[in-house]
Amino acid sequence: MKFSTQKPKKTLHMVSLGCTKNLVDSEVMLGRLSDYQLTDDAQNADVIIVNTCGFIDSAKQESINTILSLHEDRKNESVLVMAGCLSERYKEELQKELPEIDVFTGVGDYDRIDELVNEKRSNFTSEVFLASETNERVITGSSYHAYVKLSEGCNQACSFCAIPSFKGKLHSRTLQSLVKEVKALVAKGYVDFSFVSQDSSSFLRDLDIKNGLELLVEEVEKIEGIKTARILYLYPSTTTLSLIDKIADSKVFVNYFDMPLQHITPSMLKIMKRGKGVEQLNELMNHMKSKPNSFVRTTFIAGHPGETEDDFEALCNYVENFKFDRANVFSYSDEEGTTAETRTDKVEQELIDERAEVLGEIISQTTQESLESEVGKTFEVYIDGESEEHEYLLSARKTIWAPSIDGEIYINDNELSEGEQIKFGQIYTVKITELVGDKLLATVIK
């Protein structure tokens, strides 16, 4: 009798917290650890990696709670790794306060994670890692959609944001590098792309090219096999009317405009160091909204130091009148090393939370109106697979929407009228029949 001499694969449990930019780095780590078997069973995993977020207080707390919870239940001989932004930002403090963790690393060693795990060694490379076409990634969560990172770092000086302090200045990839990566992903079957960075509209400005995103749109359009693409995280002062036109004229890029505004009054934009004045901002936003089938998403901060009742009221009125398709609101929190932290005109925490709640309710209403406007319409969707809600429903996403954040459409058929089975990851035309809560229901036409 022959017995197999092959050793069972070691297992890896990965938790990626925070933004989609973090997710790209997590996928690079998975690529470096491809000889491990991915598992949802954290308790018995040989290696556990948490790619942390250090953006705001709630994200920091989530990162700490997640890693301590995983430590509590893990097996003795496993390796627990803390990576990413929080680890980078507080490297000295965390290494002293969390002896439970075996390996600490920040934002510079994603492509060396296999070495650090094997050697059970912490390391903080001073240069921020930027994924390129040479990094083999394991794309997660989709068989047809991938995020592609344009750049790292940021040259803006927003009063409330500490990201440049640990991610550094803007560092763009070359256009050639991006094109190579996208072509390689298309060859693997990916057809839908979301381009991300801290400040996407500044792409290539560090290389003295001011219209980097327009060039990106032109080059991506030439790649055969791409069905749809979108750009996330535009910045007001580096977004131009010509860029909006370029996206709107594209046959590949959908009219998806994601621009965090943070506020709208002249005084608050000045305090927050947010570039363009209100008139130019309104011109940009109205230009986006004027495009056919446009989808406009943004974020706001409530309770930033210096925000008066008049400022907040003006912000609420603006959000109510503009009617964003989607928006988020964050409660202001002090971040070490920022100019906002040192201001003396702080808003009381109770009032910050109250304002965030009020603005959140307005946003919920405008989002609901956006969803209600879809009922009766016919449009194209990607069908992702079976819904988690019910085994007889399929989960779909409007092709213009970004994955995970913009909503979910339930399809109540699993085959076409000719009896042909619906294929996951494909585009179908559907008609929206009703809205139940915040979920759209649809039937497949073709």
Curated annotation (Swiss-Prot):
SMART domains: Elp3 (SM00729). Residues 10-122 form the MTTase N-terminal domain. It is found in: Cytoplasm. One of its GO terms (cellular component) is cytosol. Its EC number is 2.8.4.4. Keywords: 4Fe-4S, Cytoplasm, Iron, Iron-sulfur, Metal-binding, S-adenosyl-L-methionine, Transferase. Residues 140-369 form the Radical SAM core domain. It comes from the Bacteria. It catalyses: L-aspartate(89)-[ribosomal protein uS12]-hydrogen + (sulfur carrier)-SH + AH2 + 2 S-adenosyl-L-methionine = 3-methylsulfanyl-L-aspartate(89)-[ribosomal protein uS12]-hydrogen + (sulfur carrier)-H + 5'-deoxyadenosine + L-methionine + A + S-adenosyl-L-homocysteine + 2 H(+). Binds 2 [4Fe-4S] clusters. One cluster is coordinated with 3 cysteines and an exchangeable S-adenosyl-L-methionine. Coiled coil: none annotated. InterPro entries: Elp3/MiaA/NifB-like_rSAM, Methylthiotransferase, Methylthiotransferase_CS, Methylthiotransferase_N, Methylthiotransferase_N_sf, NA-bd_OB-fold, Ribosomal_uS12_MeSTrfase_RimO, rSAM. [4Fe-4S] cluster 1 binds at residues 19, 53, 85. One of its GO terms (molecular function) is protein methylthiotransferase activity. CDD domains: Radical_SAM. PROSITE patterns: MTTASE_N, MTTASE_RADICAL, RADICAL_SAM, TRAM. One of its GO terms (biological process) is tRNA modification. [4Fe-4S] cluster 2 binds at residues 154, 158, 161. Its cofactor is [4Fe-4S] cluster. Residues 372-446 form the TRAM domain. Belongs to the methylthiotransferase family. RimO subfamily. Catalyzes the methylthiolation of an aspartic acid residue of ribosomal protein uS12. PANTHER family: RIBOSOMAL PROTEIN S12 METHYLTHIOTRANSFERASE RIMO, RIBOSOMAL PROTEIN US12 METHYLTHIOTRANSFERASE RIMO. This is Ribosomal protein uS12 methylthiotransferase RimO. The gene is rimO.
